[in-house]
Amino acid sequence: MAKYLESKDSEFNQEVLYRTGENYKGEQTYTPRLVICDLKGSLGTLRHESELYEPTEGSRQAHAWTGKMELFESDPIKKNQYLQSLDTPDGEFKLSYAGDLSKNVKVWSDFNSLYYHPTTVYELTTHTHDDENNRFLLPTRGREVYQELAMDETLMDVRIRQFMEESDNPQGFQIFANSFDGFSGVAAATLEYLAEDYPKKARIVYGIAQPKSTSLSKEQTLVQNINQALTLKCMSEESTLYIPMRAPSVLKYGHGVWQSNLRKHENMYEWSGYLAAAIETATSPFRLTNAFRLDMADLSGLLNPHAFNSTTALAFGLPLSLPQSRDTSLASIFKADEKMNRFESAWDLTLETPYDQIDRTSHCSFSVFRGIASILQHQYPSLNGLQPYSITQVTEELTNFTKRYGPMLAQRLVFLSVVGPTFPQFFGPMVTTTGLIRPTSPKDTDQIGQSEKMLTPEPVTQCASYARLHSGSALKPLFEFAVASLKVSSLNNWVYTDYTHGQFGLDRSDFESSRETLQELCDAYGESVDYDDSFSDDN
């Protein structure tokens, strides 16, 4: 990590997200400016105390106590291939551990390689990971847990305030939270605290939803829809930007150009990796070292200029369809459907469409094109001897794209998306290890001297990506669906009764009030665009 942070070639300032410190041995450390809240039992092999900073509590007691000791310990959690490789740094390190991780990941720490500050990890001790008898399902329960654990003090004052006080002019906060379960309630309470204590700092929230699945029961689907509607209402009011996100659904993988370059996401390890890549690409301008760096507050002002409704959509394409041969023109790569204004090399993670619907009339749009020129340097020359596209040529074509489908503020990044050894290998067989797309016809294959073995999957180590944040009337269907989700009727009243319990319980009037607020936000959008019923329950 230290070697990466000290890189002179990176266009990113890693200290925006990482802090320097010193451990108990006097050695310099790099740890993320991060607080993680998770359930008891979700840490896996991750220790509560980090030996990066101090000896473990058991080690300190062993040195301090001279009397008889009786030791009780549980069986150690077996480490997967990747974590074992970290324990043997001199051993062989594979390009990808995704195959093993995809089968064996149980918690996020199974693919963690970072050291954390002692105040980073915060366990919600009221609930246990994978406890079917005490599930953390409702936002009302999340707010109760926030109060029961006195998180105003134990989380906000002790942990977050410490990171803020040691930071030099922090841009703001990024909050990542499930929008479909109890964590949405914890996030809502946290956001309200931040809005009160740091009103001038940007607060960008990412609401993570599970991919739609036919395996969910009717009750589970109703509960998730209600939770997401309540989260949308709260986050739209308290955040400077709220970005609801859902990974591409297997039910829609048959649509869109992008899907030919990806396999279906099989599990949470894979689909969460896709969402993480989208967020990392879209927010990369926050960390630039040059004059083109974009502050979090500036982005919030661009996408939510009147501070009326912070909800924003995120479209993402990874990998971009950059051909292995130079024979394909750049103009054809970045060509959207002229009639429908759709860029089909991306998936809208908010509107759940297998394309990016571009509104040429809206100024509330920000795009990031990442690593395109770097990836194209690996192209084969054309039959006419043309060499790979230069950075200047790529810049000109991207400028033309933003003019054709603008007004659009865009950022071009040279630094490509590096596919690390723990990142899911959900790429299709036509994607090369350098992130280019192999030709599909036998004629094209023969021209560049390839053979049948080219279809053998190989780890993808880098790729180009595209992300676009946008707001405006395109988001109206999102609010229409939320309004419908909060409509109490005789058919679904049995589900709503679960929300009435506890100190933060909601009755029928509370739901009606939230529904009215969402309806007002919905009406403010005016006429909406037809999005093929993206939000219907049967999709």
Which functions belong to the PLM regions below?
Residues 1-539:
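Terminal, contiguous helix-loop blocks that mediate binding/assembly
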